[in-house]
């Protein structure tokens, strides 16, 4: 198991490479990363104001001209009006190309701060300090940034890799159990597409898997980050292989849009994973036991595995706008077996109806 007292590092082998550091008490690493930056802007959510101010004050004590920029919570922050506000503040405080941003918050904060870094002066450095499980295992790793529009989720964005990701496990201690469970959906995804040991660890003790200061969750984080880092290192710009990280996300993004982004991302991904497994099963690509295993594991973590039985027509409309769609043809990442991701292109409408019926039962 991962020792929470001794930070571990997972390298993301892009150009240039960067570390994902997992542990506790990571302030020294932040100091080192920002040592040569004259000016720094810390983008954070309202609930983290006190801690963000402590970071700002600490950096100021080191001679850094540090500023805070507060952004709205969750998906409300991933809006063009928020970006306009951020750009205005970055200009006012004088962030230059040799300066840096710090994202401090959950996955949505990482997405919007990363997009700000990608677009300001055509790209400035950023360090991600995720404070949620979802941020640690997914949003902060891989360089995807973006905001939402009326057309859909994350359709406006850029690839912009960080200087580093600092995943301080101590920040998870104050999170509600539902928030940790939400992040576990992405961990489970990593298990099904690449690392079945993740699934074994969760099945052995689901509740221990949700304990941020126990021995299981840090190991799950390390393994999930390793899966994503490996995929991103091989396919940074999502030309083909990286698409497997979207397992469960085609339906998930449609659900989020239908729910006006009021559902937790992990809850939507959980439903999306079950749907993708059912779709593979009814298509004859996945065995019954592995499909059922999705349902069992996600349920054991308190995550939803069903959705509104009457919602399919609207969800299909939204899925047609998914970024994986080509020439109007739906594409799904599915499994051909445990840790054997594949694609299902242009499935027969009857398959979609049958798979969704299993989901909404």
UniProtKB/Swiss-Prot annotation:
Coarse class of the protein's main subcellular location: cytoplasm
Under InterPro entries, the record lists:
Dehydroquinate_synthase (IPR050071), DHQ_synth_AroB (IPR016037), DHQ_synth_fam (IPR030963), DHQS/DOIS_N (IPR030960), DHQS_C (IPR056179)
User: Which cofactors go with this protein?
Assistant: NAD(+); Co(2+); Zn(2+)
CDD domains according to UniProt: DHQS (cd08195)
Q: Which residues bind NAD(+)?
A: 73-78, 107-111, 131-132, 144, 153, 171-174
What detail does the entry give on cofactor binding?
Binds 1 divalent metal cation per subunit. Can use either Co(2+) or Zn(2+).
Chain positions recorded as Zn(2+) binding sites: 186, 249, 265
Spell out the disulfide connections.
none
Q: What job does the chain carry out?
A: Catalyzes the conversion of 3-deoxy-D-arabino-heptulosonate 7-phosphate (DAHP) to dehydroquinate (DHQ).
The family annotation for this protein states:
Belongs to the sugar phosphate cyclases superfamily. Dehydroquinate synthase family.
Name assigned to this protein: 3-dehydroquinate synthase
Organism whose genome encodes this protein: Mycobacterium leprae (strain TN)
């Amino acid at each position: 198991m991962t020792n929470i007292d001794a930070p571990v590092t997972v390298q993301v082998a892009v150009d240039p490479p960067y570390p994902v550091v997992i542990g506790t008490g990571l302030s020294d690493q932040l100091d080192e990363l920002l040592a040569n930056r004259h000016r720094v802007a810390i983008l954070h959510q309202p609930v983290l104001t006190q801690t963000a101010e402590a970071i700002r004050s600490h950096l100021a004590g080191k001679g850094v001209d540090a500023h805070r920029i507060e952004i709205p919570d969750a998906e409300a922050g991933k809006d063009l009006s928020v970006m306009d506000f951020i750009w205005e503040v970055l200009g006012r405080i004088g962030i230059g190309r040799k300066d840096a941003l710090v994202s401090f918050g959950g996955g949505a904060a990482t997405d919007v701060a990363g997009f700000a870094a990608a677009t300001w002066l055509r790209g400035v450095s950023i360090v991600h300090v995720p404070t949620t499980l979802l941020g640690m295992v997914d949003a902060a790793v891989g360089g995807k940034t973006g905001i939402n529009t009326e057309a859909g989720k994350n359709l406006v964005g850029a690839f912009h890799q960080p200087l580093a990701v600092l995943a301080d496990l101590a920040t998870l201690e104050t999170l509600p159990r539902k928030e940790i469970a939400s992040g576990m959906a992405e961990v489970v995804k990593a298990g099904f597409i690449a690392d079945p040991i993740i699934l074994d660890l969760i099945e052995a003790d689901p509740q221990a898997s949700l304990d941020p200061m126990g021995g299981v969750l840090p190991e799950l984080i390390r393994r999930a980050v390793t899966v994503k880092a490996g995929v991103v290192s091989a396919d940074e710009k999502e030309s083909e292989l990286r698409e497997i990280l979207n397992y469960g996300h085609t339906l998930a993004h449609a659900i989020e849009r239908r729910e006006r982004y009021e559902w937790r991302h992990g809850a939507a991904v959980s439903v999306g994973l079950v749907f993708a497994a059912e779709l593979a099963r009814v298509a004859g690509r996945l065995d019954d036991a592995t499909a059922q295993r999705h349902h069992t594991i996600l349920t054991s973590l308190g995550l939803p595995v069903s959705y509104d039985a009457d919602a399919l027509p609207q969800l299909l409309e939204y899925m047609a706008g998914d970024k994986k769609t080509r020439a109007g043809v739906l594409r799904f990442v599915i499994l051909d077996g445990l840790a054997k991701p594949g694609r299902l292109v242009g499935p027969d409408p009857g398959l979609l109806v049958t798979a969704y019926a299993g989901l909404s039962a």
